């Protein structure tokens, strides 16, 4: 019964793994609900900020901020948001494939690329596969704050202010629903014009600023970029927990299938051993 004992040990090992993946699935489900609540709470602010900035991009402004001006793209920047932990299926690798494809297109046109990475998985990926990483941030946990992102975003904004970047994008996973999460790349700078049809007028939007347009726009536009990156981090976190829950459920189900298969093999091995013992007993009795 040496073979049967080995199979029994394998069954015990798989059952232990199944308990772990089941626990991780339940933890991910709990975290997913909390992260979805955080995402939904911050989304109205981010959406409203995006709409206001879209109006400004269409506006006839007294003070023309550099973030509103289009210029030839000679160097572009990406803020890439990933997870800190693995075991979340293809969430990160699909994101990296998308940004790498776009980076390849820029490179073929002779455009240089700078990267700011958020999340240890993005840091490890671009350190291994190449990329000019100028800022990195990780260990934000399950409750990231805007203050933790200001430094990373500030590095890219400074480079843009100094003319070292001509485009700035944010890359993260978008939460569609619990079954669908899609990698997305959105332009932050120069400010994209509003896509709202109601805003597409033949005349330019005009605003009166109090007290002065320059300090107001300077603060507002920086806060816009920070809010979009923060929303990207929160949304990516929700995607991470959903993907991990699904991956752990699949692992738990697969473990159950393996246990069933091993149990069948064990039963057959045990049956064969019993049959052999009976045959030996019968043969011995016949010899007597």
Swiss-Prot record:
Q: How does it sit in the membrane?
A: Peripheral membrane protein
Q: Where in the cell is it found?
A: Cell inner membrane
Q: What is its main location?
A: membrane
List the record's Gene Ontology CC terms alphabetically: plasma membrane; proton-transporting ATP synthase complex
Keywords, ordered alphabetically: ATP synthesis, Cell inner membrane, Cell membrane, CF(1), Hydrogen ion transport, Ion transport, Membrane, Transport
Return the HAMAP family for the record. Answer: ATP_synth_gamma_bact
The UniProt function text for this chain reads: Produces ATP from ADP in the presence of a proton gradient across the membrane. The gamma chain is believed to be important in regulating ATPase activity and the flow of protons through the CF(0) complex.
- Name-wise, this protein is ATP synthase gamma chain
List the source organism. Aliivibrio fischeri (strain MJ11) (Vibrio fischeri)
């Amino acid at each position: 019964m040496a073979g049967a004992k080995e199979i029994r040990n394998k069954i015990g090992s798989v059952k232990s793994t199944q308990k772990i993946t089941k626990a991780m699935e339940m933890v991910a489900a709990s975290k997913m609900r909390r992260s979805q609540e955080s995402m939904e709470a911050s989304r109205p602010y981010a959406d409203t900020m995006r709409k206001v900035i879209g109006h400004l991009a269409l506006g006839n402004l007294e003070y023309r901020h550099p973030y509103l001006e289009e210029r030839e793209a000679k160097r572009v920047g990406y803020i890439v948001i990933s997870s800190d932990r693995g075991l979340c299926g293809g969430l990160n690798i699909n994101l990296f494939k998308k940004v790498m494809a776009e980076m390849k297109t820029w490179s073929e046109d002779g455009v240089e690329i700078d990267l700011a990475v958020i999340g240890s998985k993005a840091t490890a990926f671009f350190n291994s596969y190449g990329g000019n990483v100028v800022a990195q941030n990780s260990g934000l946990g399950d409750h990231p704050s805007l203050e933790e992102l200001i430094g990373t975003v500030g590095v890219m904004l400074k480079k843009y202010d100094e003319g070292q970047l001509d485009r700035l994008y944010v890359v993260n996973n978008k939460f569609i629903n619990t079954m669908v999460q899609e990698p997305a790349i959105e332009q932050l700078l120069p400010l994209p014009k509003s896509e709202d049809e109601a805003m597409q007028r033949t005349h330019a939007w005009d605003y009166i600023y109090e007290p002065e347009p320059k300090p107001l726009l300077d603060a507002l536009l920086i806060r816009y970029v920070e809010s979009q990156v923060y929303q990207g981090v929160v949304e990516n976190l929700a995607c991470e927990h959903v993907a991990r829950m699904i991956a752990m459920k699949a692992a738990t189900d697969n473990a159950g299938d393996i246990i069933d298969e091993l149990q069948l093999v064990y039963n057959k091995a045990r049956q064969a051993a019993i049959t052999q013992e009976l045959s030996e007993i019968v043969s011995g009795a016949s010899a007597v």
